[in-house]
Amino acid sequence: MASEHSFDISAALDKQELKNAFEQAKKELDSRYDLKGIKCEIDLSEKESIFKLSSSSEGKLDVLKDIVISKLIKRGINPKAIKELSRESGAMFRLNLKANDAIDSENAKKINKVIKDSKLKVNSSIRGEEIRVAAKQIDDLQAVMKLVKELDLELNISFKNLK
C-alpha cells in the first residue's frame, strides 16, 4: 500500500466528446422544422475548441446556441465551461463559443485556497494547468473532491491520476 495517495485536478475537455456534441448539434440543425428555410451554420474549430455559429436571424442564433449547449450537456460537458467570445451582426449574425479547457491561474489559486482553508490533512500544489493534491488517507482526498465539486467554477472540473 502506498504511503501517500494523490490525484490531479484539471479542466481538460474530452475532444472526442466535443466533436460528438458538434456532430449531434449539426444533425439536429438539419432536422429542426423551425430552422428550415433559414440560413444557419454550426462549425467547430477543434484545435481551439471554438464553436462558430451563424444565422440570418438573431433569434435563431440563440436557438443554435441552445442546441449546442444541450448537446454538450448530454455529452457530459459542464455548460459553465462554455464562454461567449464574440457576437457579430450584419447580413449574418455570428456567435463564437469557446470551450474552456484549462484551469487559469486565478481559478487555480481559488481552488488551492479553498483546499488549504478546509483544514484537511492534504497538500496541494499548482502545476501549470493542473493542481496536484496529496494526502496519507484516501478519505481526505475524497473530501477534497467533494469540496471542489461544490465550488461554483466556470470550468469542466475532472479528477485524474488517482494513486
From Swiss-Prot:
CDD domains from the UniProt entry: YajQ_like (cd11740)
Domain of life: Bacteria
InterPro entries to which the protein is assigned, alphabetical: DUF520, UPF0234-like_C, UPF0234_N, YajQ-like_sf
Molecular function as annotated in GO: nucleotide binding
Keywords associated with the record: Nucleotide-binding
Gene Ontology cellular-component terms listed: cytosol
Homology family: Belongs to the YajQ family.
Physiological role: Nucleotide-binding protein.
Name of the protein: Nucleotide-binding protein Cj0374
Organism listed in the record: Campylobacter jejuni subsp. jejuni serotype O:2 (strain ATCC 700819 / NCTC 11168)
